[in-house]
């Protein structure tokens, strides 16, 4: 199958809170494809009706949309309906992993390690008992929306009095909020490409956690790949990540975030089914350490499209 003879839509932008990030990823992907002789075109679903792709002669989609509307199963479902092959995870894995709470519940059911958490919804917010939550989970706490990506709406809660306002803030972004035990150890992210686990990256943000600014804007966030784990720990992490990837039904490529608790135990955090592909992005950094260039990575992801 010669993909260079196909007309490829690079889906970028979109309508989520992560629109700008998706543009940055999309431009980098588009440039890599064009440089290698692919017939690729930028398509922003905010400006163009994706249902017309096939009619307009497109054969395949490289989906680099981030967040709701692009990474949550809806775009995948639309592409399935029109019969257009696309990169990344399918409808079910995309929809499931967009929901951090249900992803963690599934992992827990598989016996995989996740942080202890309390779930609060808009409906149950009035019954929230901060004292009881702190008694169970301790301090500090992490409060985050279940559905929004890119670390939007996060708060670190250091005192019981701050919990309610942190939940109220998170409720601006989603109806379901997770209050989680604070994981004090290393922050790691692990890419998976075509069922192969790539080297882990250790993230050391300048601030207290890896928020939107640290992720996309700050040059002071430090990344270490290799992550400085012993070979045994790297192996243990790779096995855990592959089990987590398979449990939620990922395919093609994804990146799984993992935190360590104070004792160094791994805790699964979330799945990114369309990881960032910018100059700052972590997936390309990891791939580079095993000799896969950015251009090769883009082509490989395209080749894995179903």
UniProtKB/Swiss-Prot annotation:
Pathway: Cell wall biogenesis; peptidoglycan biosynthesis. Its EC number is 6.3.2.4. Mg(2+) 2 binds at residues 270, 272. InterPro entries: ATP-grasp, ATP_grasp_subdomain_1, D-Ala_lig_Van_CS, D_ala_D_ala, Dala_Dala_lig_C, Dala_Dala_lig_N, PreATP-grasp_dom_sf. Its main location: cytoplasm. Belongs to the D-alanine--D-alanine ligase family. This is D-alanine--D-alanine ligase. It comes from Haemophilus influenzae (strain PittGG).
